[in-house]
UniProtKB/Swiss-Prot annotation:
Plays a role in DNA repair through recruitment of the FA core complex to damaged DNA. Regulates FANCD2 monoubiquitination upon DNA damage. Induces chromosomal instability as well as hypersensitivity to DNA cross-linking agents, when repressed. Targets FANCM/FAAP24 complex to the DNA, preferentially to single strand DNA. The gene is FAAP24. InterPro entries: DisA/LigA_HHH, FAAP24, PND, RuvA_2-like. The C-terminal region is distantly related to RuvA domain 2, a DNA-binding domain. It is found in: Nucleus. Disulfide bonds: none annotated. GO terms for molecular function: chromatin binding; DNA binding. The keyword Coiled coil does not apply. This is Fanconi anemia core complex-associated protein 24. It comes from the Eukaryota. Its main location: nucleus.
């Protein structure tokens, strides 16, 4: 298995249909939830990445404890975001304890970095989500849901679920918005009038307000 030097954001060789996991997750509930359902390989020196789903797509996982503790997770996100070699999505534990901190991480991840953010209630839910995304990628490798494209596909589960979390959107409006604005970047640059034409004035106000926050 080819691996990166410590603290690297370079590509990783990942066999098709496998997940390469950071050694720190060995024995965790998250890893146990995936074992037996997908081929999991542990590697040292994956910092700042937690899981590689393909050679250029990865997951950055923010635990409840990390979210409550402060903004220490931000450096990891920025390093992957600034890498031209990796496309990362962020999975965050949104629990009763950490829920009050979710708007801040959402603003930083989606608004400031333009990255996909997926909230989960537990590590077991996260394991199911990661398996689902890898299976989606395995079924349709040409429609890799982690790779940023000029035009995103509405069926991409990661992008769709991330947009659903934006205030004022939800499950019904997210596909409509992605048909008109195929990426988070395009959605963030949409005018209030353009948003109103898709989702109506009330939802448009909330969405526009989210993307108009000071950065």
């Amino acid at each position: 298995m080819e691996s990166n030097p410590p603290d690297s954001t370079g590509p990783m060789h990942v066999p098709f249909g496998h997940i390469v996991a950071n050694e720190k997750w060995r024995g965790s509930q998250l890893a146990q939830g995936m074992q037996g359902k997908i081929k999991l390989v542990f590697e040292d020196g994956l910092t700042p990445v937690d899981f590689y789903l393909s050679s250029k797509s990865c997951i950055l996982y923010i635990t409840e404890a990390e979210l409550v503790a402060g903004n220490g997770y931000r450096k990891r996100l920025v390093r992957v975001r600034n890498s031209n070699k990796l496309q990362g999505i962020v999975v965050v534990e949104k629990t009763q304890m950490s829920e009050q901190y979710f708007p801040a991480v959402q603003k930083f991840t989606v608004l400031d970095l333009g990255m996909v953010l997926l909230p989960v209630a537990s590590q077991m839910e996260a394991s199911c989500l990661i398996i689902q995304l890898v299976q989606e990628q395995t079924r349709e490798p040409s429609k890799n849901p982690f790779l940023r494209k000029k035009r995103a596909l509405v069926s991409e589960p990661a992008l769709l679920r991330s947009v659903q979390q934006i205030p004022g959107v939800g499950k019904v409006k997210a596909p409509l918005l992605l048909q008109r604005f195929p990426s988070i970047q395009q959605l963030s640059n949409a005018s209030l009038r353009e948003l109103e034409a898709v989702v109506g004035p009330a939802a448009a106000q909330r969405i526009h307000a989210f993307f108009s926050q000071p950065r």
